[in-house]
Amino acid sequence: DVSSPGDPDFDLFGGYIDLFLKLKQESSGWPEGVETEEDKLQYIKNYADHERIQLEYESIDKNPAMRSIAKLLLNSFWGKFGQRLNMPQTSFFHETEADKFFRTLFDPSKEVTDFHIINEDMLHTTWKNKGNLVKEDYQTNIFIAAFTTCWARLKLYDLLHKLGRRVLYFDTDSVIFVSGKDDQEPEVAPYLGQLTNELATDDHIVEFVSGGPKNYAFRTFKGNEVCRIRGFSLHYTNSQILNFRSMLDIVTTDQSKTLTVTNPSKITREKLAVKLYNSVEHKQYQLVYSKRAIVKHSFDTLPYGY
């Protein structure tokens, strides 16, 4: 909640949230089941009544790029409040600024962590403020950052409690669960803070496997396969090696097995030379699961200390 509890019309960040939430919702396209002209007009009216945001009919169209940008701006806004104050600083000094360089080097309030000569004329220096000498920054607010992340987790825990042992996998803002014939389905809606179905209404997951946090794959009723592994670029070549079948094989048959994928043009940063260049990168994939205790001779996990 980004409004003042005493005055719902006094929004601290309302304008910012409304702008990018509007862009995100419009670029998501029409929701499943909204097909007729009457359905579309009713959807716009319901959204305005619920969120106080007026969607533009002509602007509602699937645009993955715009949706990603709007989502990034919404999410990074909260992270900014929790940003560390004492971030490393970079300074460049020309040969005519030797006095400034030495003032920085011997400043008792600064800790110089690195410097090197770029060329005959320029010097590059990295430094940060020492301990309790960090200046107060009024653009950060740890209380807002903590409240936002805690509130999101409370919503997640509430859903996990309702689903119980039906849960197969969950992350910060997503849950994959088993749905039986008589099981009650969580409510989905297109509004802020509510659940949305990431699959089409006429499709569902039939096989699922996970090799750890942010590391899972599944196959749907319609035959679509999805594989998501943090830190791995799954372009066409790599997806021939890392996919649903290969992950399932590792988890169910040989959990010590490793797979190697290659990125022929990895963008690498060379700090000392302050340059970017492409290089060949080889990465190994293997089962890594250390956040919960794995129950022996099963695929169940339990929290540590349970």
For the regions a language model picked out, list residue spans one by one:
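Conserved acidic
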Residues: 1-306
